[in-house]
Amino acid sequence: MALGSENHSVFNDDEESSSAFNGPSVIRRNARERNRVKQVNNGFSQLRQHIPAAVIADLSNGRRGIGPGANKKLSKVSTLKMAVEYIRRLQKVLHENDQQKQKQLHLQQQHLHFQQQQQHQHLYAWHQELQLQSPTGSTSSCNSISSYCKPATSTIPGATPPNNFHTKLEASFEDYRNNSCSSGTEDEDILDYISLWQDDL
């Protein structure tokens, strides 16, 4: 009788210890662990989907059955290695693209600088041409003509030309100086006026 009661007490102690081991805190901890493992597996699954098949085939050394749609999926370590390699290749493409853009920008700047130099040269040549064709030369020619005309009137002492003719001569000569004294035909006209005036004397 005492032995049976002792065995019953031992069985009850085992149940109490088992229930204590499977308590609510342990159950919650196990649930959190299962959820964490599930999230990690889902993350690796999504990461495998973003790795191009060409990168997987290149890094798997041509082994069959590996990659998207294959029977054998990538391990976590292989997935991380291929993701790192894929990121490295993307960085290389971006770097080459930036270099190409910088090269094109440099060529555009050189072309713009060349165009500005050409425009500056054209403007300088046009300015030089304008200086050669400026009214300064015609003014000096008018002054030389007027200096040439004045001695002609003073070479004949005591000569007194008619007033009307002298007025016409001054008006014609003034019009010649103001408008187009650089014309060769009007140079001949003024000389004809002088010759005519000398003949009348």
Swiss-Prot record:
InterPro entries: bHLH_dom, HLH_DNA-bd_sf, MASH1/Ascl1a-like. Residues 1-32 are annotated as: Disordered. Residues 1-10 have a biased composition (Polar residues). Residues 24-90 form the bHLH domain. Keywords: Developmental protein, Differentiation, DNA-binding, Neurogenesis. GO terms for molecular function: DNA binding; DNA-binding transcription factor activity; DNA-binding transcription factor activity, RNA polymerase II-specific; protein heterodimerization activity; RNA polymerase II transcription regulatory region sequence-specific DNA binding; sequence-specific DNA binding. GO terms for cellular component: nucleus; RNA polymerase II transcription regulator complex; transcription regulator complex. L(1)SC, SC and AC strongly label the presumptive stomatogastric nervous system, while ASE is more prominent in the presumptive procephalic lobe. One of its GO terms (biological process) is ventral cord development. Disulfide bonds: none annotated. Efficient DNA binding requires dimerization with another bHLH protein. AS-C proteins are involved in the determination of the neuronal precursors in the peripheral nervous system and the central nervous system. This is Achaete-scute complex protein T5.
